[in-house]
Structures are given as C-alpha cells and as structure tokens.
C-alpha cells in the first residue's frame, strides 16, 4: 500500500484567530500538551509530511450558540482545501430545529455530525440527546467522543443504550470505542454492526500488543485511522499505528479503504 492512500477520520481545526486559545483549552481539559495550534493550514502541511491524502475535520459546539458559526467555518475550510477534506458539522442536544439543521448542513456540503458529551456536558442517554439521535438516525452519520473515566457522560454503557434504541444510527465511537475505557468498550460495543471505531488518541496509551488486540476485537471493516490533531501530529499517530504490525489487509482497510467507503469518497 502506498502512503498516498491514507485517510484521517478524526481531526479538529479552528479559525486562525482563536486556534491557539482553543487548543490550549483542550490541553487544559485533558492535562496533556497539544502538538500544534490547530489551524487548517498547518493540518494540511502535516498531512503532506505524513503522506495523508484526505482528512475528516470537525469541531465541537460547547453550547448551541456556536453551532452555526462552527459549521460555516468547517464548510468554508473544506472548500478552501478542495479534495483534501471532508467536513462534519457541530450539533448539540439543546439545538432548536434539529431537522432544519440537518437540511442546512447538507446544503453546506457537510457529511455528518460530531459531538463530545464530556465537553458539552450532557449524558448520551439524556432525553434531549436521545431525541437528537432519533432525528439523526438514518439521515447522517455521527462521530461520538466516547469514554473518559473522569466523567460518566459518554461511557460505553450509556452508548449501548443509544445503540439499542437506534439500530440504524451510523456512528463512529472514537478512541477505540471509549477513551481510557478500552476493555469496557469492546465488550459492550463490538457486536453492533452500525458501530465503527477510530484509533485516535488511543495508541499512545497502549502497548503495540494491546493496541493490536483492541483493534482485533472489532470487525476489520469497521476500524478507521484517526489522528486527533492537534492532540498529536499525523506523523506520530501513523508511526504508532505502523508499530502495531497488523497484516497488510488490516492496514489497507484501516488506513484507507474503510474510511473511503464510510465517507463515500470517489
């Protein structure tokens, strides 16, 4: 497989004027340093360095107030770097007129949604969140930050309630199904055929042997490569992934083919 055939499913970008402030907030939230300021221009240069051909970008609306400005920015960024990026829209359970928002982001060329319950401070199985999932189900996919032992908002057990209620909700449970809760995640989520997982912000905390084991608990058709830029550089995450020593077929699927099909890239 050539290095030109790599897709990153999980990258965050911010407007240049607030990028450093935004990434500093992320670093504070996780008590971990970020690698870069989180601008789209720097992401593209990092992709070029790592040999990554395409990325899926998104940002999180901490309150409903920020949804539309974020989505405009993501849409404009995708257009600016035509062919290199797919955009996922921000959404929040407190948003008004979610059906209207779905229509709006489709017209903007955005292909799905992204949520981060721990930062947005809602539980996955809250009534408003369940209503949101019901309105999204069958219409657009969603990337969900799952897992964090410090909180109870997005743990695998709550995610299971969502999946049981909405069997046609196509979702990516980020960070191998549950950041810092990897064992609970695969035991709880791996059997759901509508669930994908990504590798972002997981491999740094797992030995190559454990990372390989975690990935193989899921169907190889439903694992996607993610960098979580700007938490890590694309080169760092790609190096960690290569150190897993997966089979050629597993690498090709996870680094490229699965995401190509998931994002419906031509």
What positions do the PLM features span?
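Catalytic pocket-lining loop regions of alpha/beta-barrel enzymes
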Residues: 111-112, 121-224
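Short active-site segment of divalent metal-dependent hydrolases/proteases
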Residues: 13-14, 148, 178, 231
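Active-site gating/metal-coordination segments in enzymes
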Residues: 53-54, 62-143, 148-150, 191-193, ...
